[in-house]
Amino acid sequence: MLYDGRALVLTSEKEACNRYCLLEVSPLGVKEIAAWDCDHVWKEEPLLFTDGQNIGIIKAGREMVYYTGDFSHPEIIAIKDPQSILPKNAQERYFQIVSDSDQIPVCFEDQVYTNQARNFALLEFDRENKQAKWTTYSHIDKKDLSHHDMSSDACPKIDSMKSWKQELYAFTSGESQTSINKWGMDYYALVKIFSDGRVIEKIFESDCLKGAGKKAGVNGLFTDTDYLILTPLFKNDDWKGKQKLFSLATRELCDIALPRGMSKHKLQNMTDNCCLTYLYDRGLKELALCQID
């Protein structure tokens, strides 16, 4: 989301899943900024990020399309020597990218492709000189997570990452390699990490969910504020399926109250003054911008 309350949405067209659209959502309506075909959608999933004023789209780890001003004349910026950092088979996965610095965290899959990122890389972006390069490729070191699976080499999954005040945060939804919608998660945690994936601090983590007697789990999504959106996987949990917010600044949990008639919407992102919600039912059905009281 931008500082002025506009939201940017990267989506694929319903009739052609290999055609992507970049949309601007504002109180004036929805405006298409760009559209392009992607021949290898699964391997080259584009990623969208913003610094609150400008927009960047990372394509296949090799180049960036950078929009400034009125977004009508984007610049193409080649990412320097990506093969020196990124493994050959690493594939970008789109999870909300949030950064307030020149270090942009990006999630990846490698070897096993199930749309569940377990690796990340940091992209160093010099906005003034229009230069970009990958600086590290790693995964979350699970040995400091209380309920990690010692019998498996699987790395923790990464729901979302955020670079905030020169520190790196990640939300992991556990290590399970089976369907979490069918069996639930094994654990989840919010951690502060070093760039090599070592855990600095466990801000919070769940109990071991596999022995809880019922399916459970929570997904986490960082926003353009200090808040993390927490979304329960199941509606019969202690939160009754309702989203909550966790503040990185105050370390407090709070409830979300959406406007009347929008109970089926989910919160996707927010600034200090407004938020973006969506209704998803076998595809994106609705988007809404709401003011925050």
List the model feature ranges, each with a label.
Residues A35-V41, I77-A90, W134-A154, I200-K214, ...:
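Surface-exposed loop and turn segments in beta-propeller and other repeat-based domains
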Residues A16-L22, G61-T68, Y113-L122, Q177-L190, ...:
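Structural motif
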Residues V25-G29, T68-S72, D126-N129, F194-D196, ...:
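Short loop/turn segments that connect beta-strands within beta-propeller blades
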Residues K264-D293:
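Blade-level signature of beta-propeller repeat domains, shared across WD40, Kelch, NHL, RCC1
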Residues V9-E13, I58-A60, V106-Q111, F171-G174, ...:
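Recurrent small/Gly-Pro-centered beta-turn motifs in extracellular repeat architectures
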Residues W42-E44, A90-R93, A154-K157, D186, ...:
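Beta-rich catalytic cores
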Residues M1-Y3, L47-D51, R93-S101, K157-W164, ...:
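Structural signature of eukaryotic scaffold interfaces centered on beta-propeller domains
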Residues T172-G174, W183-D186, S206-Q243:
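Loop/turn-rich, solvent-exposed surfaces of beta-rich toroidal or solenoidal domains
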